[in-house]
Amino acid sequence: MTVLLGVAHGSRDEAAQEVVRTLLDAAGERLGVLALPAYIDNASPSIALALEGLAIAGHDDVVVLPLLLNAAGHSKTDVAGSVQRARLDHPQLRLHYGRPFGAHPSVVTVLEQRLVEAGAADRPVVLVAGGSLDPDANATVAATARLLWEGRAHPTVDVAFVSATGPTVEEALLRAPDAVVSLLFLGPGYLPNKATTAAGDRIVSAPLGAAPELVDLIVERYREALGNDVRMNCDACL
């Protein structure tokens, strides 16, 4: 039986880990497979330990999915590198590597749901993400912002970042002082907390969380990977 290994960024916040477990439990039930978490940092198990455990347990077919919102260094280098090393260390494992969530309509739908829940369905928005030195990853955030604006009631949707690049949340809110803040993060943790602090007294919508739409997306990415139908811009991949 194929195993789904969902790789999240990792957080010391137990609530963030619970989001990952809930998503994977639901996706595993939908697919009829064992679905387990692994983390890049700040939580365990690591990708290497998780894959080693699966090999020792006798599993021979694993789909590794980055539960990440864009294709930054984590998915292109950290997770990809771990998969590459595991192929050498555990040649009995067939490893299929999927792509991250990206600027997918399911992500945009959940972002809008969180804004509606916050009473901000028709307000200007600053979409806040983690930020990366990889321009491809930052462009994905910009594409997500554009999709959030298209066909919806938000007058503007701008982007801001809490690490690695700009504009910062403070800079974006200077340009859009009446905007609400939308968190492009899977769950709670250090970076979303940093964004919330930077927002001051402005409305901040909740992170994506364990939304059913994201379960659908995990199932979609799993089937892509298992069918060797992964399509993404990999100019900067390992």
What are the language-model segments listed below?
Residues 1-238:
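Active-site-proximal alpha-helix that buttresses catalytic centers in soluble enzyme cores
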